[in-house]
């Protein structure tokens, strides 16, 4: 339909946008072809020779050099000639379409007259000429371009002859005789110029035609056709006279029209007179130079004659083909810059203003200017006018419209109607910034806090406080000199130790203002430097690269070489000397005075404060110091020593980036301009990427000759050296080893075949080739999609690739028969017809004479073999891309690709280094991997993977591929036999892939996702997600060590899948309940009662009641209860995969490891009140089976419902690699990853809950839980004497109910039966929902109206405000009668429904059964009613608008209102509904069945308002009991005795040490020994439903348990600092029941989440809000009291003073462990705190100290001792030997002294204890002092140890756990870690040579070291803890072969190994630390 559009038909050669006549590209081509300048490529050179030959034959008598070539003149002669020769009647195309045209205009509200009413005059000539021209072009396109074939076409009397891509023009009169113009110019042009000529002709024809049509419709909107015609005639005349030169003049056409528009529109247009004058004089001068004065005068007259706005604007676009490149002549630019020489230039404001204008007009290419309508008065247009509509809507016309191309000229594509943005300040330049104006608070306030009070926007500030930006710039000098602005704070970026300008918000306002201005102004200049790509999009970059690299040559190849420059310390190197020149120029150009040139002063004179020392930085300290130094006349410090320095000569990261980039660019450009290669540069700060395009000759077979190789290589190195030299001039040094050149195909920005990284520009190319499974469902669609991707890739990488790529893909998919082989012509396919096979496939390749057109097809002797070789070779080349044919899931992202590539490359490398490949194949591969500048290296090295294997994500790429390929391809019903056969072949291909993977050394552990079904019982989760090899994994899964292929493993059915359950009970299988909605509804309907609590069916309300049991009788009682909670440890060990714990009935509690993921998700969800529960669920999800379990989906579903969002959209959940960013096990196994060991028995019961204060009763600060729990616990112990101090166990009252509910809600016991037929995942939710639905009428026994009303009430409450009409129809009750009949029943039904919907909502929010007691439920429900009051008022409001119903409710005691006036006001109504609903809820809950009448006196309105107010304040929350979600007893250590030595007491008696001549006592006491199990262990964590603690540290109980009996004080108060979860205080509370406790939590960056996995919960001081200042941190949304802040210490002291009388005893427990000497600030703070507390009370303090060496221990002890004489040391042996841990008790009454303990004395105390143990060991040589570990603990420890061995590739289970067996196992396992040449059948002789050279990796050696170390411990009882020494040692293998213990050097040595890898050294230390637990089993070794 687009009948004016040439491009649709002229398809082969679309014009590039630059193809206007004057595009430098085409002009240069013409000059090259006609031999005027040196041809750039071989192709043009050949063509040029042929053209010269033709010219010689033609113009025999002339010297060719004398001939003039000027296509512009030719055009100017040709167009008028063609137009005048054309007939005056309009040609056919218009007539054919006229009817359609008029219909179109009719739809716009115009009636178009018939054709004969129009007088087309001149337009007809243009139109007819354009049509004939188009016909000629289309014909010329279709003919084959054969060598030397000449074609001629005739238009009117002109002949066009096409020769060699050039067109000669003959005939006609006006000077076209014999192909000459006047003056000896040849009438000839290139084909591209001819196309451009047609474009011009076509555009003019359209313009005139549209003008004619519009003339009749909207005469005022368009200029007259004759005006346009005469303008065109003038233009032609000018071009004829001046040729190419006249184009410069025509370029000024748009500015000239602009000046006239300025005159017509006046001020509104905002053009300065200066500007108009400049343009006009400049144009006149140019016309004068070109001798076109008269012609130009006529033209300006034409412009001036048009005084109407709209027509004038239409003239704007007449010469748009000239406006494209906007290459202004130098004179023009100089003249315009001359504007700044006016006298006004002294005033900076004027000057800046002029600069703005000039840049605005000439540097922003206003090619879009004609798209913008200046504000036009649309009143003159008719209302139906298309133009008017487009303008008013501000949107573009419909491009699909048939006439769109006509519209393009006249109905300009308006983007939007704008005002010209020429304002009087620079502020249009600025990007606005938020800016804090005032920083006095920083300087004056000692505890500085961020000043959020006065945020102003920068521009607003300038507007209010300064006249203009110019004024600010003018003040730059004084700002620079101002001394008060000298202090700023910066942060140090820890990773790179660079200074980051992030803290520059602390600069004072003015310097910062300059900073922002400078950057913004510099940013504007980036228009002058298109290389700066900070803001460019990927598409822009790709376009730019593509445009630069276009090529049209045949066999000439191009190497795209990218160099990425990296500069040493870029910012620091930006000194004054190397940037000064550029900065001064910028200042001059922009007229900004000192803004840029003095930029370095700010850094040099400023005091830069280390802002990271404290946050926010304490500037007051520095200000005082600065003042002091200034007074002394000292300039400034030069060191960080005082946390400050000055005299910074370089720059600061993040400031002035733009201008420095410019400095760098200018240097780089200088070098590149000398190379004269096509290049483009991208720069961003110091990151400069240079893309060079180097032409090279490629041989016929596609290879590259060695000489070309060398040429490219030397070119590349010379550019490198040039760059280095040039940059050195400006003081910048290149990191040359990182300045890489790279070329070839890349994926994700990494080059696949050479170790160099590829650069920014290509990063996105690979993504094109990853195909999403949603887009391509079947093979054909897939292939179609693939080809488009290949196109995209070929834009970015060199051309050879796409051909290979396609072959690789086809070959790799197993569709082998689809591609037989590849030749330089392309791929040969088996289904091609013979004649096509032999033709050269690459079209457009020009052959030289005598070259064959066909290529002989050699018949292969063995085609199958050849095909296989090709496939093998191509699959090496495309190893990384082998996965492309399979659709991959979108979320696989880079990780899957990277891992897959790593696998493929590993296999390739293996094959290449095996030296087994035939030479032929190696040669093939070499030719494919032929990198022009690759260094001559071992081929295998090229296949080093650019990716590191990522172990932490869910599914391996290969398994995804297999899964998807199987499901998509097998399930398709493929009709095509041939294709089906291919798919079968592909299946076989997959199996091959499996075999390859099966043999590979390191299978990606993410295949675990599939293996996991089988290995559930066997594996420890840690092992699956970390370093297991394929072999180990299979060994574990299949119980036999031989290699099994992965495929058989994946297909093997799981023997016994284990489902992880939340909680369940033992019961007969027959009772299993199938979860189907129908079934649930039937149950509900059959058991429907009239009240909530029916006899037949228990409801959730009933299941909540409980009774308390005395713990002493629990053992007997639990036998009848048959409850077992299957409690899963977060890491099930290999054997005890079910860690069963005996405990109370309801413990849906999950141990988890929390990963950064949760913290991140938390931040993203902050502010969502439902966040907490969802996060708990998410962290649970981390630890359960990820794929096989239905539970996972349930959890995700719950989260999504809780948060109301799609979890996959959370960035943090998508970026899973970040989530598990634990870097292996460097520095010891990450403790949060480990299972349970002595150091963290409690890890798995702690939970990092992110809690925040929400305004509801269900989220309350966890601190309150603990304090409230402790208080209530104390209360219940004192009140219930019968329980003898123990807390009761809580069990359900109605066991049957619970049994039933349990079955219905969470039956997950039997996986095969656990399926919802309707796809319901969340059974509890389904239960609630179906329960609250209305039962079917037919299923109810009988229903009287009262019952129906009750049901409807219930339905109303559950239906969230939907219309109850349906329900009433259902129960045959008329809606009107509802209120009048039984309002009381309606209300009671409503309250019942409300209770249900509330319980349901709690289930959704909290994700597990909601079990509050009724007393707790009531206040929560009241609060809920208050919150949802509007909804209830809508549904029940009508009850209170009728007098009768209101009275009835009043009489029933449900309504508090005696109606005064009815209807009530809205507020009264809401209050009435609220109170009434609350009343009816309490009645329903309390009475269960009956309703008592209530007294008439209701609650007053004020009380309701007050109540609502209270409910909304935090204070109110504290009185509402928190619902008990879980009752918890987390005593993991039942029956585990603390170790105490049975020694004569004097061995450990106190000993006196001499210190500086004085005797000081240092006690070392052991813990008391008691034969009975500690009877009050129930205290570990209470069973009382009043306490909801998330796990108390059982270990701190061990440590503190014997201390209270040693203290002879009766404290009035206990203060706990850093007490974690409050476990440490429990023994003291047992000892003294009376004293209150204050918790305060120490906080430091390092201890947000402590290393052993428990959350440091910060109970503030007793109640919320007492501590001085709470700092909210991003990681933990809880208040933390930082004792290093003086205000907080004061608050603690105040809190203590308020609660005690003077000199009463206070006990302070300090649980801060692990403080090295770097923690001096903290230690000092605690010391200060202790001293200030001592002034007010008699202070006894207990401190936990755990240090790794005695020196630190002593230092800490001395600081804490506060000069006391003595300190008692309680030593806890339940610990590893490599730590010094003790409790230090410092009594209040001992005398003061100045002495300090020496390291020696403390060492002696520890020595004494150690000696004691040795003595004990000697006394009882037959048995070890540690009692036998209880079986459960033993299993846990064994699981830990065996999972460590598993990671080393060895299976250790229970039967191995005797020292002899373990020694045998390790001695024989060692040699098996090595690959021997042949199996060691005769074990006594093996030589060192028989060890394969590559068989021993660093990993293996690490394992050998671990084994040898263990052997030493097992044989000699020496468990060496000096890890640094161990890693240096050598391991030996002796005859047998067997492994020797460490330090044992055998006589016969088969082999010896030593660990080299640094990374492995760290890992090894971690492994050994973990294996140290073996000491628990074999403390004395073999003895």
From Swiss-Prot:
It comes from the Viruses. Keywords: ATP-binding, Host cytoplasm, Hydrolase, Methyltransferase, mRNA capping, mRNA processing, Multifunctional enzyme, Nucleotide-binding, Nucleotidyltransferase, RNA-directed RNA polymerase, S-adenosyl-L-methionine, Transferase, Viral RNA replication, Virion. Disulfide bonds: none annotated. Its EC number is 2.7.7.48, 3.6.1.-, 2.7.7.88, 2.1.1.375. One of its GO terms (cellular component) is virion component. Residues 559-756 form the RdRp catalytic domain. It catalyses: RNA(n) + a ribonucleoside 5'-triphosphate = RNA(n+1) + diphosphate; a 5'-end (5'-triphosphoguanosine)-adenylyl-adenylyl-cytidylyl-adenosine in mRNA + 2 S-adenosyl-L-methionine = a 5'-end (N(7)-methyl 5'-triphosphoguanosine)-(2'-O-methyladenylyl)-adenylyl-cytidylyl-adenosine in mRNA + 2 S-adenosyl-L-homocysteine + H(+); a 5'-end (5'-triphosphoguanosine)-adenylyl-adenylyl-cytidylyl-adenosine in mRNA + S-adenosyl-L-methionine = a 5'-end (5'-triphosphoguanosine)-(2'-O-methyladenylyl)-adenylyl-cytidylyl-adenosine in mRNA + S-adenosyl-L-homocysteine + H(+); a 5'-end triphospho-adenylyl-adenylyl-cytidylyl-adenosine in mRNA + GDP + H(+) = a 5'-end (5'-triphosphoguanosine)-adenylyl-adenylyl-cytidylyl-adenosine in mRNA + diphosphate. Residues 1588-1785 form the Mononegavirus-type SAM-dependent 2'-O-MTase domain. Its main location: virion. Pfam families: Mononeg_mRNAcap, Mononeg_RNA_pol. It is found in: Virion; Host cytoplasm. May form homodimer. Interacts with the P protein. RNA-directed RNA polymerase that catalyzes the transcription of viral mRNAs, their capping and polyadenylation. The template is composed of the viral RNA tightly encapsidated by the nucleoprotein (N). The viral polymerase binds to the genomic RNA at the 3' leader promoter, and transcribes subsequently all viral mRNAs with a decreasing efficiency. The first gene is the most transcribed, and the last the least transcribed. The viral phosphoprotein acts as a processivity factor. Capping is concomitant with initiation of mRNA transcription. Belongs to the rhabdoviridae protein L family. This is RNA-directed RNA polymerase L. The lineage of its organism: Viruses, Riboviria, Orthornavirae, Negarnaviricota, Haploviricotina.
């Amino acid at each position: 339909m687009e009948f004016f559009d040439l491009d649709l038909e002229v398809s082969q050669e679309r014009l590039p946008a630059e193809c206007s006549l004057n595009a430098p590209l085409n002009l240069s081509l013409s000059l090259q072809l006609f031999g005027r300048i040196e041809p750039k490529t071989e192709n043009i050179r050949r063509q040029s020779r042929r053209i010269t030959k033709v010219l010689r034959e033609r113009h025999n008598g002339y010297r060719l050099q004398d001939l003039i070539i000027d296509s512009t003149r030719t055009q100017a002669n040709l167009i008028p000639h063609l137009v005048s020769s054309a007939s005056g009647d309009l040609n056919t195309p218009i007539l054919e379409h006229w009817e359609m045209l008029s219909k179109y205009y009719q739809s716009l509200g115009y009636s178009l007259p018939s054709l004969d009413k129009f007088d087309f005059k001149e337009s007809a000539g243009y139109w007819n000429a354009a049509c004939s021209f188009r016909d000629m072009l289309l014909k010329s396109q279709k003919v084959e371009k054969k060598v030397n074939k000449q074609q001629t076409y005739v238009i009117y009397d002109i002949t066009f002859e096409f020769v060699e891509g050039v067109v000669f023009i003959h005939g006609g009169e006006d000077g076209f005789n014999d192909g000459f113009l006047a003056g000896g110019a040849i009438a000839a042009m290139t084909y591209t110029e001819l196309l451009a000529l047609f474009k011009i002709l076509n555009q003019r024809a359209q313009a005139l035609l549209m003008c004619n049509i519009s003339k009749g419709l909207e005469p005022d909107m368009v200029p007259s056709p004759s005006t346009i015609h005469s303008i065109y005639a003038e233009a032609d005349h000018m071009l004829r006279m001046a040729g190419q030169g006249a184009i410069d003049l025509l370029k000024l056409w748009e500015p000239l029209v602009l000046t006239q528009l300025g005159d017509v529109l006046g001020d509104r247009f905002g053009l300065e007179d200066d500007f108009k004058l400049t343009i006009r004089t400049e144009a006149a001068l140019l016309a004068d130079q070109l001798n076109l004065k008269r012609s130009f005068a006529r033209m300006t007259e034409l412009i001036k004659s048009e005084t109407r706005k709209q027509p004038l604007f239409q003239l704007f676009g007449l010469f748009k083909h000239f406006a494209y490149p906007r290459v202004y002549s130098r004179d023009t630019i100089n003249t315009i810059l001359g504007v700044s020489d006016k006298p006004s230039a002294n005033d900076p404001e004027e000057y800046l203003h002029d600069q703005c204008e000039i840049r605005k007009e000439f540097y922003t290419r206003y090619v879009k200017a004609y798209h913008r309508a200046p504000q036009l008065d649309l009143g003159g247009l008719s209302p139906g006018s298309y133009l008017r509509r487009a303008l008013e809507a501000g949107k573009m016309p419909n491009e699909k419209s048939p006439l769109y191309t006509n519209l393009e000229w006249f109905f300009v594509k308006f983007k939007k109607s704008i005002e010209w943005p020429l304002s009087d300040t620079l502020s249009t330049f600025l990007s606005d910034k938020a800016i804090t104006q005032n920083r006095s608070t920083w300087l004056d306030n000692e505890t500085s806090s961020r000043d959020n009070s006065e945020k102003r926007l920068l521009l607003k500030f300038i507007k209010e406080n300064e006249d203009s930006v110019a004024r600010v710039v003018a003040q730059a000098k004084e700002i620079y000199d101002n001394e008060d602005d000298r202090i700023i704070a910066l942060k140090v970026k820890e990773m790179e130790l660079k200074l980051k300008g992030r803290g520059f918000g602390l600069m004072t306002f003015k310097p910062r203002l300059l900073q922002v201005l400078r950057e913004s102004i510099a940013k504007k200049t980036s228009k002058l430097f298109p290389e700066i790509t900070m803001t460019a999009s990927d598409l822009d970059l790709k376009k730019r690269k593509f445009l630069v690299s276009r090529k049209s040559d045949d066999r000439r190849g191009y190497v795209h070489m990218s160099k990425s420059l990296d500069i040493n310390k870029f910012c620091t190197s930006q000194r004054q000397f190397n940037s000064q020149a550029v900065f001064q120029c910028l200042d001059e150009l922009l007229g900004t005075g000192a803004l840029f040139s003095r930029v370095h002063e700010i850094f040099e004179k400023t005091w830069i404060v280390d802002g990271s020392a404290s946050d926010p930085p304490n500037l007051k300290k520095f200000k005082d110091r600065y003042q002091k130094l200034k007074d002394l006349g000292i300039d400034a410090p030069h060191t960080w020593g005082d946390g400050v320095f000055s005299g910074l000569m370089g720059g600061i990261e993040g400031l002035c980036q733009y201008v420095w980039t410019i400095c760098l660019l200018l240097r780089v450009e200088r070098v590149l301009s000398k190379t004269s290669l096509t290049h483009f540069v991208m720069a961003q700060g110091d990151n400069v990427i240079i893309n060079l395009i180097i032409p090279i000759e490629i041989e016929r077979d596609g290879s590259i000759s060695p000489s070309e190789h060398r040429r490219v290589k030397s070119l590349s190195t010379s550019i490198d050296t040039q760059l280095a030299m040039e940059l050195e001039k400006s003081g910048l040094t290149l990191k040359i080893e990182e300045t890489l050149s790279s070329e070839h195909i890349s994926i994700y920005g990494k080059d696949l075949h050479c170790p160099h990284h590829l650069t920014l520009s290509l990063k996105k190319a690979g993504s094109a080739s990853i195909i999403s499974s949603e887009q391509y469902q079947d093979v054909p669609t897939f292939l179609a999609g693939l080809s488009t991707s290949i196109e995209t890739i070929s834009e970015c990488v060199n051309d050879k690739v796409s051909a290979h790529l396609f072959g690789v893909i086809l070959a790799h998919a197993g569709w082998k028969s689809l591609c037989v082989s590849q030749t330089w012509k392309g791929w040969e396919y088996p289904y091609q017809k013979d004649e096509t096979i032999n033709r050269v496939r690459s079209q457009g390749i020009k052959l030289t004479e005598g070259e064959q057109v066909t290529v002989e097809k050699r018949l292969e002797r063995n085609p199958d073999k050849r095909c296989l070789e090709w496939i093998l070779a191509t699959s090496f080349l495309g190893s990384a891309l082998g996965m492309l044919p399979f659709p991959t899931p979108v979320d696989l992202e880079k990780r899957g690709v990277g891992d897959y590539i790593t696998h493929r490359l590993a296999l390739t490398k293996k094959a290449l280094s095996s030296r087994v490949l035939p030479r032929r194949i190696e040669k093939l591969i070499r030719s494919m991997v032929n990198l022009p500048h690759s260094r001559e290296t071992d081929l295998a090295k090229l296949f080093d993977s650019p990716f590191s294997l990522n172990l932490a994500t869910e599914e391996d790429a290969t398994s995804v591929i297999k899964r998807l390929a199987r499901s998509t391809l097998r399930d398709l019903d493929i009709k095509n036999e041939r294709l089906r056969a291919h798919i079968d072949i592909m299946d076989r291909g997959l199996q091959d892939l499996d075999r390859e993977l099966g043999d590979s050394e390191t299978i990606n552990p993410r295949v675990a996702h599939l293996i996991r079904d089988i290995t559930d019982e066997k594996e420890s989760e840690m092992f699956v997600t970390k370093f297991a090899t394929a072999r180990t994994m299979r060994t574990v899964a299949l119980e036999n060590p031989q290699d099994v292929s992965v495929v058989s493993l994946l297909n093997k059915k799981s023997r016994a899948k284990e489902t992880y359950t939340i909680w369940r009970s033992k019961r007969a299988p027959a009772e299993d309940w199938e979860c189907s909605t129908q079934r649930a509804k039937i149950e509900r309907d059959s058991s429907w009662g009239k009240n909530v609590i029916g006899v037949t069916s228990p409801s959730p309300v009933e299941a909540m009641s409980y009774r308390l049991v005395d713990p002493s009788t629990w053992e007997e009682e639990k036998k009848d209860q048959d409850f077992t909670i299957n409690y899963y440890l977060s890491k099930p060990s290999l054997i005890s995969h079910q860690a069963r714990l005996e405990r109370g009935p309801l413990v849906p509690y999950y141990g988890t490891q929390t990963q950064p993921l949760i913290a991140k998700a938390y931040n993203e969800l902050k502010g969502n009140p439902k966040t907490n529960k969802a996060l708990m669920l998410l962290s649970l999800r981390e630890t359960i089976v990820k794929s096989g379990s239905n539970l996972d989906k349930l959890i995700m579903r719950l989260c999504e419902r809780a948060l109301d969002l799609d979890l996959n959209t959370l960035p943090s959940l998508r970026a899973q690699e970040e989530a598990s960013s634990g870097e292996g096990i460097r520095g010891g196994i990450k403790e949060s990853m480990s299972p349970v060991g002595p150091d963290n028995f409690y890890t798995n019961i702690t939970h990092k809950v992110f809690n925040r204060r929400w305004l509801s009763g269900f989220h309350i600060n966890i601190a309150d839980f603990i304090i409230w729990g402790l208080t209530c616990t104390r209360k219940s112990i004192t009140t219930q004497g019968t329980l003898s101090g123990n807390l009761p166990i809580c069990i359900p009252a109605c066991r049957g109910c619970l049994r039933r509910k349990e079955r219905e809600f969470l039956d997950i016991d039997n996986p095969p039966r656990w399926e919802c037929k309707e796809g319901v995942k969340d059974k509890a939710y389904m239960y609630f929902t179906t329960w609250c639905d209305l039962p079917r009428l037919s299923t109810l026994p009988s229903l009287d109206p009262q019952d129906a009303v009750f049901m409807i009430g219930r339905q109303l409450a559950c239906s969230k405000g939907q219309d109850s009409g349906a329900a009433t129809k259902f129960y045959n009750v008329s809606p009107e009668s509802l209120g009048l009949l039984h309002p009381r029943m309606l209300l009671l039904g409503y309250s019942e429904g409300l209770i249900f919907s509330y319980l349901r909502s709690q289930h959704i929010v909290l994700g597990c059964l909601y079990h509050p007691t009724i007393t707790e439920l009531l206040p929560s429900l009241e609060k809920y009613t208050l919150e949802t009051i509007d909804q209830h008022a809508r549904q029940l409001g009508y009850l209170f608008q009728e007098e009768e119903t209101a009275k009835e409710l009043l009489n029933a005691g449900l309504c508090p209102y005696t109606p005064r006036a009815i209807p009530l006001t809205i507020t009264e109504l809401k209050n009435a509904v609220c109170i009434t609903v609350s009343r009816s809820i309490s009645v329903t809950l309390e009475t269960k069945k009956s309703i008592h009448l209530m007294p008439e006196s209701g609650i007053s309105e004020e009380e309701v308002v007050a109540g609502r107010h209270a409910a909304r304040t935090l204070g109110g929350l504290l009185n509402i009991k928190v619902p008990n979600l879980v009752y918890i007893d987390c005593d993991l250590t039942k029956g585990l005795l603390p170790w105490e030595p049975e020694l004569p007491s004097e061995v450990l008696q106190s000993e006196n040490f001499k210190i500086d001549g004085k005797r000081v006592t240092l006690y070392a006491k052991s813990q008391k020994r008691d034969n009975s199990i500690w009877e009050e262990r129930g205290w570990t964590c209470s069973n009382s439903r009043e306490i909801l603690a998330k796990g108390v540290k059982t270990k701190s109980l061990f440590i503190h348990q014997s201390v209270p009996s040693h203290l002879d004080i009766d404290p009035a108060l206990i203060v706990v600092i850093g007490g974690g979860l409050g476990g440490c205080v429990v023994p003291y509370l047992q000892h003294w029941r009376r004293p209150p406790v204050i918790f305060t939590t120490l906080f430091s960056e390092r201890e947000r989440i402590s290393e052993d996995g428990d959350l440091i919960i910060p109970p503030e001081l007793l109640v919320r809000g007492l501590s001085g200042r709470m700092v909210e941190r991003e990681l933990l949304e809880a208040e933390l009291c930082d004792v290093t802040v003086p205000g907080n210490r004061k608050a603690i002291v105040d809190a203590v003073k308020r609660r005690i009388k003077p000199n009463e005893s206070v006990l302070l427990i300090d649980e801060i462990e692990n403080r090295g000497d770097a923690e001096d600030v903290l230690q000092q703070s605690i010391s200060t705190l202790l001293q200030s507390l001592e002034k007010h009370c008699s202070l006894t303090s207990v401190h936990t100290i755990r240090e790794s060496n005695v020196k630190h221990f002593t230092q800490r002890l001395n600081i804490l001792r506060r000069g006391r004489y003595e300190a008692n040391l309680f030593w806890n042996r339940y610990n590893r030997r490599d730590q010094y841990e003790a409790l230090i008790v410092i009594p209040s009454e001992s005398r003061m002294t100045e002495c300090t303990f020496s390291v020696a004395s403390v060492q002696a105390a520890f020595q004494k204890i150690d000696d004691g143990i040795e003595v004990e060991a000697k006394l009882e040589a037959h048995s070890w002092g540690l009692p036998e570990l209880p079986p459960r603990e033993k299993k846990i420890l064994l699981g830990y140890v065996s999972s460590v061995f598993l990671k080393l590739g060895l299976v250790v289970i229970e039967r191995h756990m005797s020292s002899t067996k373990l020694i045998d196992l390790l001695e024989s396992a060692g040699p098996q870690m090595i690959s021997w040449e042949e199996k060691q059948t005769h074990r006594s002789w093996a030589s060192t040579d028989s060890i394969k050279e590559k068989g021993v990796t660093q990993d293996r050696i690490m394992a050998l070291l671990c084994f040898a170390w263990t052997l030493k411990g097992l044989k000699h009882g020496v468990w060496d803890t000096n890890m640094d020494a161990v890693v240096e040692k050598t391991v030996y293998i002796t005859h047998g072969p067997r492994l020797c213990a460490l330090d044992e050097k055998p006589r016969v040595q088969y082999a010896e190994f030593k660990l080299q890898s640094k990374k492995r050294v760290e890992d090894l230390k971690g492994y050994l630390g973990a294996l140290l637990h073996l000491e628990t089993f074999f403390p004395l070794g073999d003895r």
